[in-house]
Regions:
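Iron-associated oxidoreductase/ferritin-like identity signal
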Residues: 1-123
Length: 123
């Protein structure tokens, strides 16, 4: 019985976190997941910045919308992180740039938001 346990252990791969995984994640896929995780985190911070801009101007409907968008992006990032952990992978958090915080008008902010989302969808 001990011999069977030893043979089974040899068939199991372990990820960097020490958790057993069925199959290691391909490096290029892992790099893409980390890149997407970083994009989700940046979008979270950027949408939060937009929320603050509207909140400071008592534009509560817009503020509520962008707060919801910010929370949604954080949930997306969390799902990617949870997936990596479930696969036995340590999560690497890359640095994200500071968000834009000033706009001259509502139209400029909405346009910025649209262009940011469009660029994320391209990648």
């Amino acid at each position: 019985m001990n011999e069977n346990n030893l043979q089974t252990k040899k068939l199991v791969n372990f990820g960097p976190s020490g958790r057993a995984v069925a199959q290691p994640i391909d490096k290029s896929l892992l790099d893409n997941i980390f890149e997407h995780l970083t994009m989700e985190r940046y979008a979270n911070v950027q949408y939060f910045s937009m929320y603050l801009w509207f909140q400071e101007r008592d534009l509560n409907g817009f503020a509520s919308h962008f707060l919801s968008e910010s929370q949604g992006e954080m949930e997306h990032a969390q799902k990617f992180a949870d997936y990596l952990i479930a696969r036995g992978q340590s999560v690497k958090l890359d640095e994200i740039p500071a968000p834009v915080q000033t706009w001259d008008s509502i139209e400029e902010l909405i346009s910025y938001s649209f262009n940011m989302e469009a660029s994320i969808l391209k990648e």
